[in-house]
Amino acid sequence: MKNCLTIIALVYSISFLAQTQNVRGKVMDSETNYPLAGAKVEIDLKNENGVNYRAVTDAEGAFTINTVPVGKYSLTTRFMQYEPKTQTIELNSGKELILAILLQESVTNKDEVVVNGRKKGEIINELAVISAQQFSVEETNRYPGSRMDPARMASNFAGVQGADDSRNDIIIRGNSPLGVVWRVEGIDIPNPNHFAIAGSSGGPVSVLNNKILGNSDFIMSAFPAEYGNSVSGVFDLKLRSGNDQRHEFTGQFGLLGTEFLAEGPLNKKGNASFLMMGRYSTLSLFQTFGIKLGTDAIPTYGDLAFKFNFKLRKGGNLSLWGMGGKSRISIMISEKTEYTTDLYGEGDRDQYFGTSMAVSGLNYKKAINEKTFVSSTLAYSQEVQQANHDYLQRSLTINGGDTTIQIDSIYPLMAYTFKTQKISSYTALNHKINKQHLVKFGYNADLFLMNMHDSALVDYYTPNVFFTRWNYEGSCVLIQPFIQWKWRMTDNTDFTAGIHSQYFSMSNSLSPAELRLGFKHKLSGNQSVFAGAGMHSQAQPLYTYVDNRKGAGNFFNKGMDFTKSLHSGVGYEKFFTKGFSVRTEAYYQYLYNIPVTIAPSSFSMINMGSGFTRIFADSLENTGTGYNYGLELTVQKYFDKSFFFLFSGTLYDSKYTGSDGVLRNTSYNGSYVANLLAGKEFKLGKRNILGIGTKVTTAGGKRYGLVDLVKTNAEKDLIYRDSMFNELQFKDYFRMDLKISWRMNAKAMTHEIGLDLVNILNTKNLLSLAYAPSLDPAVVNSPNYQPVSEKTQLGFLPIFYYKIDFRAGGKPR
């Protein structure tokens, strides 16, 4: 017994002694990606010899620091005639930390450049000097209520808010979610969400997984010339490469799915790696345990992602990457014996809905020399939406004290399939003329192949008599060349200018020259001021161009032009010690050329893009206008000393004018939004870490109008009075979230258990009005009868997960 206890104690003590990890990476010039040989990398932790853990980069800019105790530290990188960079790193025993460190060359000729108060979370694209935020996977993973979803994480930033708790559409400065572009490796990708409605940018569950992402950029306005076809914002996402020296694995099980990730070297030379992951939904399992998901129907979905990375001779890099997802849901109202309204469905029909998206690309990058860098991507993508509805004719059956619903008949109501394929090409070349001047130029080109079919009943009460709403097979191209110039006037002053051009063949629309300007100046005392302005254009959702409801071949909106925008902003920020910063920004955006109906009405494309409905517009013309202006404040302490907090607040106004000439609130004008997040980690012993975080969000209520009851009853759909559109507002939105996690570092592995309690107070926030007819004749015939109900957003939602990171073999070279 004594020997047994001794062995157990020995094994236990070894697990404590083994809590170390390696830090590896590459140091490069931030503008040309050229490797910096001889750069010094140092961690603020002393080893057994009394000196800090440190390394010097080799001829390829690579470094390795071995056997660093797990924990959080500051890592500083220095190189002659470059500005030093300090960042916080966190090591756990299950995954090696691999960094890509970008240093900016100094304009001065001093060997040692001193820069105080370097900001953690600096934007990766240095051409973006205003309204840009680094999307840090490490930082945003701590945000409660974000469900590990990039879009929901971004909704915590100033100027950004979610449109609906059940979806991740984001509203940027009062703009429609239609204006958001998702970009990966230079390519604009299809909507990366499950259950995505055609033309939208959001959905209930993201296909993207933060475990495959590196730090990325989120840009909200006056973005550099390389970005186009957007009047709102851009997610410029970076896919990380797999570990090229040893195999590592991640498994996770929870409410949102069961997933597995594997990464590692493809050969013993360490010049090729892979990263692969897959996820499948587990909602049905949790529904069985009585956890309410906001709908009686059980959605199913699965997704995968991969990246194969190959280091080529003479500094080139080739990567093959891809991601995709498939989802489906069946809302069977006919199976219910008691009438209920459903968040995702309508009470008078069975609905079957499925979507899929996939994108795969081949990217080549090479630092040609110390001054020139080229990146080129060729990609194929596809997205499909399929749906069919069966109409239910029902009646009430009363038997004694029991009332049940009787299905009298079921017949097809509508069906559609929208399929869009895209072949994309992107090339950009960065050339550093000298220390002060950088030029970047290139193009994006997309070839769209569309196959869109839709038919519906002419009349609800006449089965099998259909009319065609969409019947189109064809193609079009979108071409976007650009050129951008950056002038580093001094080490403290940057000026950028660029021109973006855009041509869309479907409507023969051309925006020949969109000017983009940016300016940033660093003041004394770790302060800076910045300003920017830009012209932007955006095409409409593809299917809206080929609406066929007015007869075969009569695509009455095929000539729609771009929506256009002039966006400007100014700002100020101050950096303090220990990762604390304050930032404020004021902006004004004027939108014009917005599609509105030819006949006078309140309709405007500016209000479209969120929710689960497509756009059914009449004949449109580009005469609508709108504006957004606001003031944003961000007070932030980045995660340091085991604590973080973030306050973001926005006061704004968002208005538009339709073809009737009336100035109205847009559907996204909540007037204000504020977020307060805070989190603290507690170290329990040598291996365990307890994390607690909370988030409080409040915002102006959603806009709505008076219902036209006559038209609503006739159309069997919710119809508002046109003259009163968006004149009313629901009560203010309020939600509180709480996140609790426990992490344990064991030998060669890390365990984590988390509970994200979304809307912990179960606040009943109003989402919208809905068409909800009664089946009771006594109710229908009453004088005050209205077939309208209020829909609330998601209530309390506990999201549980268990995650394990572990490694197998391999030693750093």
Describe each PLM feature range.
Residues 317-367, 382-406, 410-419:
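Flexible loop and strand-edge segments within Gram-negative outer membrane beta-barrel domains
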Residues 414, 422-424, 469-475, 480, ...:
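Outer membrane beta-barrel strand-and-loop segments of large Gram-negative receptors
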Residues 193, 199, 334-335, 339, ...:
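Surface-exposed extracellular loop regions of Gram-negative outer-membrane beta-barrel proteins
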Residues 645, 696-716, 733-735, 742-813:
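C-terminal beta-signal and adjacent terminal beta-strands/loops
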Residues 83, 90-98, 114-223, 234, ...:
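Periplasmic N-terminal accessory/gating domains of Gram-negative outer-membrane beta-barrel systems
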Residues 490, 588-590, 612-700, 803:
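Gram-negative outer-membrane beta-barrel transporters
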